[in-house]
Amino acid sequence: MIAFVRANNLYLVKLLFDNSESQITVNGKFNEILNGIPDWVYEEEFGFSRAFDFSSDSQMLAYIRFDERNVPMYSFPWYKGMAPSLDQYETYPGAYEYKYPMPGIDNSKVSVHTFAIKAKVTRKMDLPLDEDGYIPRIQFTKDPNALAIMTLNRHQNRFDLYLANPRSTLCKLILR
């Protein structure tokens, strides 16, 4: 089984069952909601491009949901350049816009969800996260009933590690 993101939604492909594809999330929308794929801040600052993980028994999929609706757009100029050369901007620069939170401005609101593959049930983890907190990593442990969730506050001077039960949604603080 593999998972992938298309148009900000998560999908599963069951390789042993005629490569059937199933859509897991339906609320993904460009510049609004991202499921299983990080926003610019997470990709750049925390260095990852995949925000989902399978349980060790492959029965659950956990993912981070990014709500970037309150993050302002940022525009910067594009010039011809050399790598690659963008000939359409040889005479006049173009502009590229994307969600980019300046210091003190809202970041994406993040939450952790699990999807029970056989039951097709999605649950939101009951994680005590500051409204402007970060979730830099999630990973299932060898125990399929234990999802490790790492959190940081906005100032990144408080790190918490939680173990979440993906079925009950309860999160237990194990390290601060």
Explain the meaning of each model-derived region:
Residues 1-176:
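Beta-propeller folds
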